Amino acid sequence: MNIYLDNAATTPLDPEVFEAMKPYMLNHFGNPSSTHSHGRTVKSAIEMGRKKIAEMLNCTPGEIIFTSGGTEADNAILVSGISTFGIRHVISSAIEHHAVCHTLEVLAQQGKIQLHLVGLDKKGHIDYDHLTHLLKTYSGAMVSLMHANNEIGNLLDLDRVGNLCEEHNAYFHSDTVQSVGHYPHDLKKLKIQAMTAAAHKFHGPKGIGFMYINKDKKIRPFVQGGAQERNIRGGTENTYGIVGLTAALELAYREMEAHKKHITALKARMIDRLVESIPGVTFNGDSADIEKSLYTVLNVSFPQSEENSMLLFNLDMEGISASGGSACSSGAATGSHVLNALYPGSQRGAVRFSFSKFNKPEEIDYTVDKLTAFFKVSV
């Protein structure tokens, strides 16, 4: 079998999305900045995509800025936002995506900000009392906390954090790369100034994403060289990427409840079968709690054995693709910074299984059967 269970890293392109992109890859090739018909055709497609995305997120089209993906979007919001608003204090956590934590660490090293890390409980959820204390202490700070953790799946209460930030005059940015396309976001209700998305996390193309920037909190241009993207990001737009992103998000919203039901059942099936088949298996963070974590992610630690060091390799040899952590750092030798923050000093190995609408129950069963065989435990 050939089983893909690494959908938090990237998802396969939906064929319907590819069909939407094809005309803009082959026929509609004009530069959107050109005033002739070739340019106007693609410019219209870009602006239609922006309008559709804004409608799905309940914001205005001018608040959607296209980028190359989540990492660029997070960097732009942090670097340009801090500069634009003269922010000196940033509140974040130790388990953010590297696009956020590395950027903030560099800004702190450069003396541009003071970085304050909010406390976490043993499951990896933020300590809201500590967050409140930090907000009271550093009024006017920026808060950067991800909606859904890409490794353990923990969900942040965006409403609660947004209300706290509003109360203390804080700028709230959330990395929502893992949740856009899987959960609805109503930006008229959420008290959030900036958020990010990447199309390849919801069956769209790679190399395209967007950021939402609240119209009352516009940031300075972060890429010079052109007036594209409301004069915030210069450079010729990725037209067929934007068309693909729009099609993927429309498809995700149209089928969201059905996909959630299907994927949640797959995750529950894997949890039940692992507990039944492998004594000593544990779940990291709150990834086994369907209500408190992404329904697409399950982070698992297995009993200590010689098999742990070769587990991902052995799964790969059996045709199963999974991850030991964030795909953006899977080649690193330092292990998962998320698990290191939650379980300091622990030697536990971990595997992240992440699911999509294309996975099937028999793939879960096959995977658990192989894992059971690895650990020489009879079903």
Can you annotate each of these PLM segments?
Residues 1-379:
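Pyridoxal 5′-phosphate
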